[in-house]
């Protein structure tokens, strides 16, 4: 699909028609969720954050809004929506949830479920300065260009892991965030 031809309707159709890899059973890991917010501009974008440098974990890294599940959350989708409201002031009622991707294991011991949602273009975002240093948007056609992600195989705790690395403007996108974008790009791609 040529980058200039990328449209929101194409994405929605492909997302809903292409089943993700089978969902893994939930382990005894702590649960977390992130919202993968797709902003419905004429040229759709992903909303990303750069985490505050003052945070204990993942300080200064590019991330989707999200965090750990609370006991009060009725579902993992509710976790993603609550965290997005806390971090960037997206009202849950302004999110049209399209679905979820298979959970990924984070280096901090969480099983993280990405929740894909559409956000109206006129929505105003306000970062929680305690958690978010910066907000930025990446056009979907750039985000889903599989050639922009460079694989790196590393060994952690005597197991091999593949991480993806990418740059967007001055932002370094890697780790779980890059893995989520790459996974979503593969799901909607024309590749068999």
UniProtKB/Swiss-Prot annotation:
- Where is each Nudix hydrolase domain found? 29-160
Biological process per Gene Ontology, one example term: nucleoside diphosphate metabolic process
Q: List the disulfide bonds.
A: none
SUPFAM superfamilies recorded for this chain? Nudix (SSF55811)
Q: Which residues bind Mg(2+)?
A: 83, 87
Q: Which residues form a coiled coil?
A: none
Q: What is its EC number?
A: 3.6.1.-
Respond yes or no to whether keyword Transmembrane helix is given for this record: no
Task: State the InterPro entries in the record.
Answer: CoAse, NUDIX_hydrolase-like_dom_sf, NUDIX_hydrolase_dom, NUDIX_hydrolase_NudL_CS, Nudix_NudL
Required co-factors: Mn(2+); Mg(2+)
Question: Which family does this protein fall into?
Answer: Belongs to the Nudix hydrolase family. PCD1 subfamily.
Protein name, per record: Uncharacterized Nudix hydrolase NudL
Q: Which organism is it from?
A: Pectobacterium atrosepticum (strain SCRI 1043 / ATCC BAA-672) (Erwinia carotovora subsp. atroseptica)
């Amino acid at each position: 699909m040529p980058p200039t031809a990328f449209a929101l309707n194409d994405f929605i159709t492909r997302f809903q028609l292409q089943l993700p890899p089978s969902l893994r059973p939930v382990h005894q890991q702590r649960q977390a969720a992130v919202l993968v917010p797709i902003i419905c501009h004429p040229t759709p974008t992903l909303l990303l954050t750069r985490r505050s440098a003052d945070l204990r974990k993942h300080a200064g890294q590019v991330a989707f809004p999200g965090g750990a599940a609370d006991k009060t959350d009725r579902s993992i989708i509710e976790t993603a929506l609550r965290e997005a409201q806390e971090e960037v002031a997206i009202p849950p009622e302004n999110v049209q949830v399209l679905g979820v991707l298979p959970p990924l294991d984070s280096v901090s011991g969480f099983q993280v479920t990405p929740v894909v949602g559409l956000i109206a273009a006129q929505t105003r975002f306000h970062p929680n300065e305690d958690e978010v240093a910066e907000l930025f948007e990446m056009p979907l056609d750039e985000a889903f260009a599989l050639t922009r992600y460079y694989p790196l195989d590393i060994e952690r705790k005597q197991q091999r892991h593949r991480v993806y690395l990418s740059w967007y403007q001055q932002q370094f996108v890697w780790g779980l965030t890059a893995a989520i974008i790459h996974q979503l790009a593969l799901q909607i791609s024309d590749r068999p």
